[in-house]
């Protein structure tokens, strides 16, 4: 049986298991497959939700890359996912700015990806820099970022931002039923 509703609790102290659906029914089950996905880590930016899918993305696929042909884009993040996204988007975008809050990539990204970023003239690494504001009407049109070393802000006509800052698993409702680590 497939139920396209939100499970809110799993009672696993005896068999059959019981899955609570929203504030409503409880469904007994001999087996439960849990595919909860993750919640993207999102910076506390005004207008972020307004531009999701209209210039703000949490993944870089072929589809998004086609929207960025010949444009300047931003990839936010310092991990391997951000590095892979930057290298991938640099194939179609005119310029890819990689913004990281830290002083570099060495602690969070593989040496191989760092080398590919450094060798790609279409990729510009901006360390100790983060987005301060997103602006536009129905679609993202401008991004203001702040360099924390100098304190200077810069506004750029950029229509596509890729937040590659990780995610947190949607497993909070499984306490006591599955073993989880801190990640």
Model-derived features: positions:
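A Rossmann-like FAD-binding core segment of flavoenzymes
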Residues: 1-21, 26-29, 91-183
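Glycine-rich dinucleotide-binding loop and its adjacent helix/turn
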Residues: 38-80, 84-92, 182
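Active-site acidic short loop of glycosyltransferases
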Residues: 29-30, 53, 70, 158
């Amino acid at each position: 049986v497939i139920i396209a509703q939100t499970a809110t609790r799993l009672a696993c102290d005896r068999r059959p298991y019981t899955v609570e659906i929203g504030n409503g029914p409880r469904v007994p089950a001999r087996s439960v497959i849990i595919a909860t996905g993750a919640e993207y880590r999102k910076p506390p930016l005004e207008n972020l939700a307004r531009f999701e899918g209209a210039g703000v993305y949490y993944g870089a696929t072929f589809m998004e890359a086609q929207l960025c042909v010949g444009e300047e884009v931003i990839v936010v993040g310092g991990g391997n996912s951000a590095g892979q996204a930057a290298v991938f988007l640099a194939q179609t975008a005119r310029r890819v700015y990689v913004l990281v809050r830290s002083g570099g990539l060495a602690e969070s990204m593989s040496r191989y990806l760092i080398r590919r970023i450094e060798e790609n003239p279409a990729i510009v690494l901006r360390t100790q820099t983060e987005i301060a504001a997103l602006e536009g009407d129905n679609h993202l049109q401008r991004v203001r970022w702040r360099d924390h070393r100098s304190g200077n802000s810069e506004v750029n006509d950029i229509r596509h931002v890729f937040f590659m800052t990780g995610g947190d698993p949607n497993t909070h409702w499984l306490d006591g039923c599955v073993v989880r680590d801190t990640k």
